[in-house]
Amino acid sequence: MKINYNNEIKEKAKNVVEGYIAALNGRSVASLEIYLHFPHTRIMLNGESKSWDTAREYLDDFQNRLKEDGWHSTELLNVDTEIISKKKCHTRISFKRLRRDGTSINTYQSLYVITEKNKSWGILLGSGTG
């Protein structure tokens, strides 16, 4: 019986994205350490790259950047994964950022490079619109 690695990898990528969003919403450094690989790099909206060495640095910076918008939580809308290899995939997501009262700040798209590192899948690199 042949194992379908594509379905397995797509499911792992989806679990990583869902776990990452839950970690952000819970402001959980420990969970971010599970779902992000460090050093972690993002290509920001202005095209510049930014890297963080720890989950604490990442979360603090994330919250500071979104404070002005009144960010409270993120709602995942769509996850679409393309398998690149048995150790890497590209995952496109769309999501909404919400204020505490549930009103939408905006809808965004991101591309994540999700890799297997030390037998654990996590987001190594991200690029997005917000």
Residue ranges, per PLM feature:
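Short, low-complexity N-terminal intrinsically disordered segments enriched in polar/charged residues
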Residues: 1-30, 34, 38, 44
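Short beta-strand edge/turn micro-motifs at domain boundaries
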Residues: 106-130
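Short, cysteine-centered beta-strand-loop-beta hairpins and adjacent loop/turn segments enriched
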Residues: 97-105
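Short beta-strand segments enriched in hydrophobic/aromatic residues
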Residues: 36-37, 95-97, 127-128
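A short hydrophobic beta-strand element
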Residues: 73, 85-95
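A short, structured loop/turn motif at beta-sheet edges
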Residues: 81-89, 114-120
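A solvent-exposed, acidic/Ser-Thr-rich amphipathic alpha-helical stretch
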Residues: 29-79
